[in-house]
Amino acid sequence: LTGLLIMADWIASNTYYFPLIKTDCLGKDTDYPKRVNNAIERLNFPEFWIPGENDWGMDDALFEERFGFLPREVQHTAMEIAQNTIEPGIFILEAQMGVGKTEAALAMAEILGQKAGSGGIFFGLPTQATANGLFPRLMKWAEQQSENVKLGIRLAHGAVALNEDYQQLIKGSALSVGEDEENNLVVHSWFEGRKVALLVDFVIGTIDQLLMAALNQRHVMLRHLGLAGKVVIIDEVHSYDSYMMTFLERILNWLGAYHV
């Protein structure tokens, strides 16, 4: 709730969305619905992600449609566990390289997101290089989630200006979200600030974006607001040092409290 109030305050305080008015206009109730509607039109936020096409979760055909190959044993097992899960919790997937852990994680995210009513995912990786490397694959998966609507995506780390894929996506998002452009994934300018990065539906970035939610800092509840409705995927967790693990343990407690 605190994060939502901060977000609402920032929007309401922006004179582009709510232009200043004369003092003699204050108190006229008939003016406010029009001002709010104008602000909503100017904000033009993307739609919300609604995961899952099938009531039964994900079968082999849908998996192949998502990723271009039939599920292997590790993906079958992961999907079966996710489909039999009732309450949100922590899932640990450990396997050798090349077996498709990323695809298994995204398939589980889609299934668990449908069960929990989640509105997005956060995919945390140890370095900018690994986040950049995975970004095209996440885009391909996310594009299939947004065939009929415009959904927001964000690459979150300190050097996104050097990522060509992301910069091309920003250029393609310069048109209005409501217009009929080909790309269904958009980078919305309002969510480009570092404090609001996690509010987008699909976020892939360095793990520090998640760990900062465990710090005592201003506007930290905006990060909590973004995480509370997501499926959170943490990759290469074995590579984190004891210092990072201290913050990870704290944020996992928060995520558990939010039933993430």
Regions found by a protein language model. Name each.
Residues 145-213:
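Inter-Walker segment of RecA-like/P-loop motor cores
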